Regions:
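Exposed, low-structure sequence patches enriched in small/polar residues
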Residues: 1-274
Length: 274
């Protein structure tokens, strides 16, 4: 699109997509390898509250330039191997962020972000191993801080308690990322801001769970933060700078649709178990 008039005059957005499939598996003709690529570029006027803001705690009147963003990413999907590979590169000029005082700032120079992610799921009889790994780099950590590596693993055993009536999952969900300057949060502003006071991460966060699918009802029990920072000597489980995540706790819930939902009532779902 292109904006011809108004406050957002000269704003535009261009997107292009390309994809194709190949069929290398003779025995699995309906399971191709898919290649997809996307290119996007846009020019956008900053939001009103990035330019002007008045409150008891914050006040600013800015004259920020338009934000230019260019993105190039691609995906390789191999369903037969339960494997997905994603890679992307983003270039942002005039990026707007919030500094250590939670004041809106604009970085005039271009900042680039590169990322590669891998999703691979394994299944051995009733054992499921769902894994995701992400590697990413920011050219300017003061403006766009990122953990270099982030990992999520969901391992569980799925089995029938009563065939076609009740199914159960028992397992754990683990998240981990390397040390980084996790953003702080300003309740008065309602925004996250960059901070250089303390690094967080390098500590696994583990939830144990049990999911039960009984006909249409899904019941879950979750033991939150079962590891309490294990195996690290010092626990480090913060969702933001100064905001600690829950310590050990139990959660119990039920999801019970009172009408049929195609694709939702056939097997155990993820309604809270990870």
């Amino acid at each position: 699109y292109y904006t011809f008039l108004g406050k957002e005059i000269n704003d535009f957005s261009i997107d292009a997509n390309m994809g194709f499939n190949i069929y290398p598996f003779r025995r699995y003709r309906k399971s191709p390898i898919s290649f997809n690529a996307h290119f996007g570029t846009n020019l956008k006027e900053p939001d009103y509250y990035q330019q002007h803001y008045y409150s008891n705690h914050y006040k600013w009147d800015n004259d920020f330039s338009k934000i230019s963003t260019t993105t190039l990413d691609g995906t390789i999907s191999i369903p037969h191997w339960k494997l997905n590979i994603d890679a992307g590169w983003t270039l942002i000029k005039n990026h707007i962020y919030y500094d250590g005082q939670a004041m809106a700032q604009q970085e005039a120079s271009a900042v680039s972000v590169f990322n590669v992610s891998l999703t691979k799921n394994f299944k051995l009889w009733g054992l499921h191993f769902d894994n995701q790994a992400l590697f990413q780099l920011s050219s300017n950590e003061d403006v766009i801080p990122l953990p270099m590596v982030a990992i999520n693993a969901r391992w569980y055993w799925q089995f029938n308690v009563v065939k076609k009536v009740m199914q159960m999952q028992i397992g754990a969900n683990v998240t981990y990322n390397t040390n980084w300057y996790a953003p702080g949060y300003s309740p008065a502003l309602g925004m996250f801001y960059n901070q250089k006071v303390e690094k967080y991460g390098n500590c696994p966060y583990i939830d144990a769970f049990v999911n039960i699918q009984w006909k249409r009802a899904c019941i879950f029990v979750k033991f939150v933060n079962v590891g309490m920072g294990w195996p690290m000597e010092h626990a480090d489980y913060f969702s933001a700078h100064g905001y600690i995540r829950p310590q050990r706790a139990f959660k119990l819930g039920i999801f019970w649709p009172f009408y049929m939902q195609p694709g939702r009532n056939k097997s155990v779902g993820n309604a809270g178990g990870g």
